[in-house]
Every structure is written in structure tokens, then in C-alpha cells.
Amino acid sequence: MAAKDVLFGNDARTKMLRGVNVLADAVKVTLGPKGRNVVIDKSFGGPTITKDGVTVAKEIELDDKFENMGAQMVKEVASKANDEAGDGTTTATVLAQAIVNEGLKSIAAGMNPMDLKRGIDKAVIAAVAALKDASTPVTDNKAIEQVGTISANSDETVGQIIATAMDKVGAEGVITVEEGQALTDELDVVEGMQFDRGYLSPYFINKQENGTVELENPFILLVDKKVSNIRELLTTLEAVAKSGKPLLIIAEDVEGEALATLVVNNMRGIVKVAAVKAPGFGDRRKAMLQDVATLTAGTVISEEIGMELEKATLEDLGQAKRVVISKDTTIIIDGIGEEADIKARVSQIRGQIEDSSSDYDKEKLQERLAKLAGGVAVIKIGAATEIEMKEKKARVEDALHATRAAVEEGVVAGGGVALVRAAEAIKDLEGINEDQTHGINVAIRAMEAPLRQIVANCGDEASVVLNEVRNGEGNYGYNAGNSTYGDMIAMGILDPTKVTRSALQFAASVAGLMLTTEAMITDAPQDSAPAMPDMGGMGGMGGMGGMM
């Protein structure tokens, strides 16, 4: 077993703090409307330019293993916030850094780390409740547009295009972001359907850069049973191969010999094919297969109605303009189904919703209705260069996550104001001992850090602005974009409650673990093996004369 290096107490925490600060200092320069860019060197291609906190965090690895542990723990904060709400990564990082820095000062002054952590946790629970009380539900398009604008680093065109997309396909509709061909952003709304089933084998993937299967103008075979015998598919595969089009198979399952043969055919380029499981279970699966059949003008091959898979023809197959399959989802775009048939199917589902007495059934029927009637919105990003395109695409995806979060839990005043107000709401909170109360104060001070950082990135004096905001009430705050004070909601500076809440919770969770760390263990650096000694000349061989 390799030797280990161990650090204890203050030595460990000092190293860890150094790593935390390196990562957080790189991330926090991106915060706010006047946040700066970070340029990241890549081992191949040109550098990446970004204002996205989690992208910056993911790139940072430090030489010193103890410092790197601190950096990786803060990276976890950014990743968790990104996974939960899709935004708020920089805010979460700033909060974590502030809690760790303030907390370690208190520990150095002799306070109990466990009580300090309990105080921080108590403050966060109370602050989350205060945030929820201050939250305003998002009901109109204007609010959605404002949230999108803020999340895309104050890019109004992004806010507008997301609001329009949500208006077209509904808040629960499918919205995808693609790289466009023009210089300006475009929005396409196409009839489509998404369901939660991914490819059955990663060998079907044909877009390695994003790990998806993309099929253009495919035939779609719908089968209401498990397929394990390849002989059942041979007729269909031969007909599709002759047509030169790709094939998507949606069945209860495709396994064994059948799946292996499909993979081999796909890899050899004989026929471009992919297979996914049908969505749902039991009767719901049958109904959803029928929905796909209506959308794509296909027929569900079902033995219940006397159809055999071996006898399926091209006429039984559905068709669509495009299919995109990821690890977990399948999107069928622009099926060739007749509009009248789709409308009839939609009316039928609406009737079932009205007749149903079960809330669960109603919810599932509503989902089917959204898939059939909603369609898919595609936002095509326009930019002058590839570097700008990548940076902008990441921002739009962030903004899309944020607007969904806003619709889910509502919005609060942006610009760090909501956290300042939450801190004021809990200022009289006390712990069961002095150290816990100090932990509460650590959290309260840390909740001012995002506002301070936004102001610092603008080049203004953070303490002066914070004092002015504290003296106000409600949504009164500082608009860092134009250096004015006023009602943040009225000025359109909003943050989704879910983003602010999850940033605070994840920051406190990971920071609490760091504060209660007493030892750190890592592999000791290994000395390179010494070179073999020089053997020199083989002396002493003289005096061997006279040998015949």
C-alpha cells in the first residue's frame, strides 16, 4: 500500500482554505451584469471564453493535493447547484467561500466547529423559509423574459426568445438549444414528441461530441412485444436497407440476438438503425405507442390484432423528419401524421381526462396530451465565431434552466437583495449556546457576500451599497447594470427562488463539512526510482596470457 501524507487541525484547514480561495476567486469574477470573462486554455483547438461559473470550476485542478481537496469540495457546490436548478453556480461558490472563511476565523478563535456548523444549518433553514415567504409566482410572459435575460448575463434577446418558446410549447414543453447558421438567434417550433426512454446500446451513437443518436428522415417500426429473434426483423431490415433511409425501432424491448445483429449492421453501415424501449407500462404503453403511430402515420404491430412482425411492410412503418436519442430521452420531430388524425387523437385524450376520476391518471393523460399537442421548440443560436457560439450556447442553456426553475417555485428580487433581506429576517435568531449563535452570525454575514461581489465586479464600493440596501426594505436594491437604486422586481432584476434557495443550501452543506474537518489524508509523493549504478569497465582481466 502506498505511503500517505496526513495533516491535522489548523495545518489541514489552512491548506484546504487556500484551495477554496483559488477556485472561488476564479469563479466569482463572472458574477453579475458586469462580471468578467474567464479564458480557459484547451489541450487542442482554441481557448474557451466563458462567464459560466460551473465551467470555470470544472477546469480547476491544483498541484498541491491538500489544496486541491479544498478546491474539489467547492467544485461540488457549483456542480450540485447546477444539477438542481441549472443556474446559481457562481452565487453558490461565493456563499461557500464566505462561510468557510468566516467559519475558520471563528474556529481559530477557539469556537467549537460542531456547534458552529449547527448554528449555520439553523440559519439556513430559517433563511430558506424567509425566501419562500418573499417569493412571487411567475404567471406572465414578461416575468419569464426578465428571468431569462438576467440568467443569460443581461442579454435581452435571449430572454425574449426563451419567453416566446415557452409561450409556444408551454412551460412543460420540450425546448432544445442548437447551433444555428445565421448571425442572429432564431426560434423554430416543430411538431414533435419526447419520451423518457434512451438508446438500448451505446453502439448506436453517431454524434460522439454530445453522445446522441441522430436519424434524419427515418422509418419508425412500432412493436407491442419483446423482440429477441432477428428472423422476425429480417424482412423489414432488408426493405429499409434498400430504401437507403435509417430505421428507429420502438418495442417493449429488443434483446439478445436481435439487438446484437442490429448493432453489427449499424456499425458496418449496412443499415443505419437504433432501438429504444417503448414508453410507459402495460395499457399505458399500448396507448403511447398508438400516440406515436398517430404522429408518424405508422401502424403498431401487435399480435393482439392478428399482425405478425415477420409480415410487416414499409407501409406499416411511420416516418418523421428527424429523431434525436440520448441516454435517457427520445425526441421525434415532425412526424408525417395527418393533422386531422392528430387532432382526433388529442380530442380523444381530452375526453378521457374529463371522464377520469383518478388524479394520477389525469396527470399521465395530461402528459400524453402535451407530448402530442405541444411540439418541440428549437432555439438556434447565432454568432459570428465558433468561440462566441459555444459561450452563448452555454449561457442560453443556463437561462433556460433558470426560467423553468422560476416557473416552478417563483421569483425573488435579484442582485443578491433576496439573501440580504433573508439575513435581516433571521437576525434575531439564537442558538442554544454562544458558539451556535456565532454560527448563525457567520451564515448571516456570508449571505451578504453575493451582493458585495456583484458590486465589486462593477468597480463600486461594496460596503456603501450594502448599507444603502440594508436601509431600504422589500425589493429595494442596487441595479449594478446602471448603478441606480430602486425596486428590483419593477426593474426586471429577478432570480428564481429555486436557484437562490439551492445555492444557499448546497453552499452551507459543503462549507459545514469543511469547517468540521480535523484531518486530511492524501497519497505521499513518490520519489522517482534511482538510476542503475554505472557498472564501469570490467577491469582485472589481465594476466590471462598463455591460454592456448
Curated annotation (Swiss-Prot):
It comes from the Bacteria. Its EC number is 5.6.1.7. It catalyses: ATP + H2O + a folded polypeptide = ADP + phosphate + an unfolded polypeptide. The keyword Coiled coil does not apply. GO terms for cellular component: cytoplasm. One of its GO terms (biological process) is protein refolding. It is found in: Cytoplasm. GO terms for molecular function: ATP binding; ATP-dependent protein folding chaperone; isomerase activity; unfolded protein binding. Keywords: ATP-binding, Chaperone, Cytoplasm, Isomerase, Nucleotide-binding. ATP binds at T30, L31, G32, P33, K51, D87, G88, T89, T90, T91, G415, D495. Its main location: cytoplasm. The keyword Nucleotide-binding applies. It is an enzyme of class 5 (isomerase). Belongs to the chaperonin (HSP60) family. Together with its co-chaperonin GroES, plays an essential role in assisting protein folding. The GroEL-GroES system forms a nano-cage that allows encapsulation of the non-native substrate proteins and provides a physical environment optimized to promote and accelerate protein folding. Forms a cylinder of 14 subunits composed of two heptameric rings stacked back-to-back. Interacts with the co-chaperonin GroES. This is Chaperonin GroEL.
